[in-house]
Design a protein with these regions (language model features):
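N-terminal nucleotide/polyanion-binding subdomain common to many enzyme families
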Residues: 1-74, 195-222
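Hydrophobic/aromatic beta-strand patches that form the interior of the parallel beta-sheet core
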Residues: 4-6, 34-36, 81-83, 106-107, ...
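Short, solvent-exposed amphipathic alpha-helical segments in soluble enzyme
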Residues: 20-24, 98-102, 123-124
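Short clusters of hydrophobic/aromatic residues that line enzyme substrate/ligand-binding pockets
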Residues: 49, 54, 92, 100, ...
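Charge-dense polyanion-binding interfaces
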Residues: 87-88, 168, 216-229
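Structured adenosyl-cofactor binding patch, chiefly the S-adenosyl-L-methionine
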Residues: 116, 120-167
């Protein structure tokens, strides 16, 4: 899987890849993440990428030329999709993550300041994605959420692909509770069913826990799950 990220702050993207699972996935060649800085495509000596909005208003707006030229400079693979990180986009979820994992290439546009000149949307025509109903200072953190989530779906990123299959939301439910050593800590014990080696009972227990946890913590997800049964 190849990710190409248009960002004014490449270091924010690359630094995330220097640790833990993402570093291993990168080093093993499971994923590659390239950063393209629109500032490198400006036409003036000051490398200006933003300007005041027509019609007035607060903040600075990202100019179309640097972003469109930077995007056009990205080599597009045949099986590719382009995303724009924006609070106006469709809410990102596990279903979308699974969809994106089927592509060879995901190109991501990260905004900053007051936002994009509307012509960037009109020319590039990206799929717009949001990670929630709140505003951040830039699109880099949302882009990293997408990269991290999608990478987990790709065989070779995790030690076992089953780890991703057991994640919360993979079947519409939250993940079951997990335990490790010691068996008892400060009076809190590991459920006995997890210690008896009966895999059928363990599977039933975990499914029951997933249902109860989803019902209590995310009744909206529980309702969707019930209606799909």
């Amino acid at each position: 899987m190849r990710f190409d990220v248009l960002t004014l702050f490449p270091e924010l993207i690359q630094s995330h890849l220097d640790f833990s699972i993402m570093k291993r996935a990168k080093d093993d060649g499971v994923i590659s993440v390239n950063t393209i800085n629109p500032r490198d495509f400006t036409l003036d000596k000051h490398k200006k990428v933003d300007d005041t909005p027509y019609g007035g208003g607060a903040g600075m707006v990202l100019m179309p030329q640097p972003y469109v030229d930077a995007y056009n400079n990205v080599e597009k693979l045949e099986n590719s999709i382009t995303l724009m990180m924006t609070p106006q986009g469709e809410p990102f979820n596990d279903k979308i993550s699974n969809e994106l994992a089927k592509y060879e290439q995901v190109i991501i546009l990260c905004g900053h300041y007051e936002g994009y000149d509307e012509r960037i949307r009109e020319i590039i025509k990206p799929r717009e994605i949001s990670i929630g109903d709140f505003v951040l200072t830039g699109g880099e953190l949302p882009a990293l959420c997408v990269i991290d989530s999608v990478s987990r779906k790709i065989d070779g990123t995790l030690g076992k692909i089953e780890s991703a299959h057991d994640d919360s939301f993979s079947d519409g439910l939250l993940e079951y509770p997990q335990y490790t050593k010691p068996r008892e800590y400060l009076g809190y014990k590991v459920p006995e069913v997890l210690l008896n080696g009966n895999h059928k009972l363990i599977e039933e227990f975990r499914m029951q826990q997933k249902i109860e946890r989803t019902k209590n913590k995310r009744p909206d997800l529980y309702e969707k799950w019930i209606n799909k049964k």
